[in-house]
């Protein structure tokens, strides 16, 4: 599909392809642009390519071909990528929290990218702590600031993950299946909270989901993926039965039957610290 004009975009993907070891094609010749302040849902079955596309936007996955360009320039391995990662926050399905630490300590890790390695070994300044407390308040967890994360419910843990992302003061949030492990009521609350905050702050959000009902309820734009490529890109109101059949019935005929859907990603230590 032809991407939207870069003048209207904070991120642009041009002819991106990702092939994992073993010949597994996770993404093929994909082009798309993401507009400022838009809440976009990447919709599709497991293995459709949505997580690979999402992670490619922050170079958690290294493309086999093509390019990703932000307002800072093409994202390779230099300063443009470092600056892009600083302004791009991640929210993960399994929280990626330090369970024995408090909610506040976890949210403060969102501030580490603003300090050099030596400074991050010591308690962060009061200003950072105030930012972290404010972020916890925004997700309704001010009273849980000093509670250990492993004592919180799954929904509360995911809200800590959102607060950590907000502490990074991002221009972009990438959320990879953020409600896959939550019950329906909690999922609606978490997605509604995330969408409202992104709208209030003008944050561009790109969220991968497999649940159609959530895409219809929360998305400004739905990008449907099947067989490692984009097959739909429009407002959720434009989804037809035929298009849904294509998104949800798409099966790869080129990948081995026992190939992993989208292999796990090992994060670089520097990126792990910056989250």
Curated annotation (Swiss-Prot):
Catalysis: reaction(s): phosphite(out) + ATP + H2O = phosphite(in) + ADP + phosphate + H(+)
Entry's SMART domains? AAA
The question of whether Lipid biosynthesis is a record keyword is answered with no
Question: What Gene Ontology molecular-function terms does this entry list?
Answer: ABC-type phosphonate transporter activity; ATP binding; ATP hydrolysis activity
Segments carrying the region annotation (Disordered) are 251-275
| Residues bound to ATP | 44-51
Its biological purpose is as follows: Part of the ABC transporter complex PtxABC involved in phosphite import. Responsible for energy coupling to the transport system.
Name the encoding gene, please: ptxA
Q: Report what the protein is called.
A: Phosphite import ATP-binding protein PxtA
Q: Which family does it belong to?
A: Belongs to the ABC transporter superfamily. Phosphonates importer (TC 3.A.1.9.1) family.
A Pfam family that the UniProt record links to this protein: ABC_tran
Enzyme Commission number: 7.6.2.-
Stored PANTHER family: AMINO ACID IMPORT ATP-BINDING PROTEIN, PHOSPHONATES IMPORT ATP-BINDING PROTEIN PHNC
Supply the InterPro entries for this chain: AAA+_ATPase, ABC_transporter-like_ATP-bd, ABC_transporter-like_CS, ABC_transpr_PhnC, MetN_ABC_transporter-like, P-loop_NTPase
Membrane topology, as annotated: Peripheral membrane protein
**Assembly state and interactors?**
The complex is composed of two ATP-binding proteins (PtxA), two transmembrane proteins (PtxC) and a solute-binding protein (PtxB).
Query: Which cellular components does GO assign to this protein?
Result: plasma membrane
Tell me which UniProt keywords the record has, alphabetically: ATP-binding, Cell inner membrane, Cell membrane, Membrane, Nucleotide-binding, Translocase, Transport
Q: Which Gene3D superfamilies match?
A: P-loop containing nucleotide triphosphate hydrolases (3.40.50.300)
Ranges for the ABC transporter domain? 11-252
Keyword Cytoplasm present in the record's keywords: the answer is no
**Location(s) in or outside the cell:** Cell inner membrane
């Amino acid at each position: 599909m032809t991407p939207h004009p870069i003048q209207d975009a904070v991120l642009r993907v041009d002819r991106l392809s990702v092939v994992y070891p073993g010949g597994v094609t996770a993404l093929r010749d994909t082009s798309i642009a993401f507009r400022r302040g838009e809440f976009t849902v990447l919709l599709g079955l497991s293995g459709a390519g949505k997580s690979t596309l999402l992670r490619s936007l922050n170079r958690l996955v290294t493309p086999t071909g093509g390019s990703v360009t932000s307002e800072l320039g093409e994202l390779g391995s230099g300063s443009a990528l470092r600056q892009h990662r600083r302004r791009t926050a991640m929210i993960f399905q399994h929280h990626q929290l330090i369970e024995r630490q408090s909610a506040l300590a976890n949210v403060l890790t969102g501030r580490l990218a603003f300090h050099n390695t030596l400074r991050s070994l010591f308690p962060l300044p009061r200003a950072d702590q105030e930012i972290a407390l404010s972020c916890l308040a925004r997700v309704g967890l001010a009273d849980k600031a000093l509670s250990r994360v492993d004592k919180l419910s799954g929904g509360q843990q995911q809200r800590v993950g959102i607060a950590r992302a907000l502490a990074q003061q991002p221009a972009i949030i990438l959320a990879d299946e953020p409600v896959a492990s939550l019950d329906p009521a909690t999922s609606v609350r978490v997605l509604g909270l995330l969408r409202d905050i992104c709208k209030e702050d003008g944050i561009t959000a790109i969220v991968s989901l497999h649940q159609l009902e959530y895409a219809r309820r929360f998305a400004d734009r739905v990008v449907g993926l099947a067989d490692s490529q984009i097959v739909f890109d429009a407002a959720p109101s434009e989804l037809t039965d035929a298009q849904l059949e294509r998104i949800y019935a798409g099966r790869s005929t080129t990948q081995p039957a026992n190939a992993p859907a989208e292999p796990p990603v090992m994060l670089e230590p520097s990126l792990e610290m910056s989250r």
